[in-house]
Design a protein with these regions (language model features):
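Surface-exposed helix-capping loop/turn segments at secondary-structure junctions
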Residues: 86, 152-165
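GST-like domain detector, emphasizing the conserved glutathione-binding G-site
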Residues: 1-137, 141
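Amphipathic alpha-helical packing segments from all-alpha helical-bundle domains
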Residues: 136-155
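A short acidic/glycine-rich loop-to-helix N-cap element
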Residues: 130, 185-192
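Conserved, non-catalytic sequence blocks in retroelement Pol enzymes and Pol-derived host proteins
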Residues: 65-67, 164, 190-192
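GST superfamily/GST-like fold recognition
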Residues: 97, 161-188
Length: 192
């Protein structure tokens, strides 16, 4: 099956977590909004507006898989995980990696809020003072708590990945989190 990924063409954002899973698995997919002309962003906007679809997505990223349209990063990864060999096949295992991905989703919100603590509608420069305060608290309190949790998960797994010796979409998402932090906070991340 050829998957269609819909996400903004010029940023990695939440769509990158899905892209990494698709790429790692060697899945057949097209990044729709990166197409030119009407087949790109306008095609994505048509689905968002929902005139031709019974269950329209709210915002990107979303994935079209045959007749299904699946929104929300963690939900997309839950769907793709077993199909791409990036999640366990048993229910308990699938729910475990989904739980970890939802925890990553919480962390993504906190990371975003270091640059946009007041609102996403203002540029960073317009909320710089609040961003500095949010960043201070993020680094002092929130990020260490999340990192300790994922270190514990990895320690208990018995292998280099959250599932032990098998790579999962959560491992790819943790990679993306760390790379994103290195990009957004290069000086602070040198300490890690």
């Amino acid at each position: 099956m050829r998957y269609e990924l819909y996400y903004w063409p010029t940023i990695q954002g939440r769509g990158e977590f899905v892209r990494l899973a698709l790429e790692e698995a060697g899945a057949d997919y097209v990044d729709v909004a990166r197409r030119r002309g009407k087949r790109g962003v306008p095609a994505m906007m048509t689905l968002i507006e929902g005139a031709r679809i019974a269950r329209p997505p709210f915002v990107p990223p979303f994935l079209r898989a045959g007749k299904l349209v699946i929104g929300q990063t963690a939900n997309i990864l839950l769907y793709l995980g077993g199909r791409l060999g990036l999640a366990p096949r048993d229910e308990a295992g699938r729910l475990w990696v989904h739980q970890l991905q939802l925890t990553i989703t919480d962390l993504v919100v906190l990371i975003h809020d270091t640059h946009h603590p007041i609102t996403g509608y203002l540029y960073y420069e317009e909320q710089r003072a609040a961003a500095k305060l949010a960043t201070k608290h993020f680094w002092r309190h929130r990020l260490p708590k999340f990192l300790r949790y994922f270190e514990r998960v990895l320690d208990k797994s018995g292998g280099p990945y959250v599932l032990g010796r098998k790579l999962s979409y959560v491992d790819l998402s943790l990679f993306q989190i760390l790379e994103g932090l290195r990009y957004a906070f290069p000086k602070r991340m040198k300490r890690f």
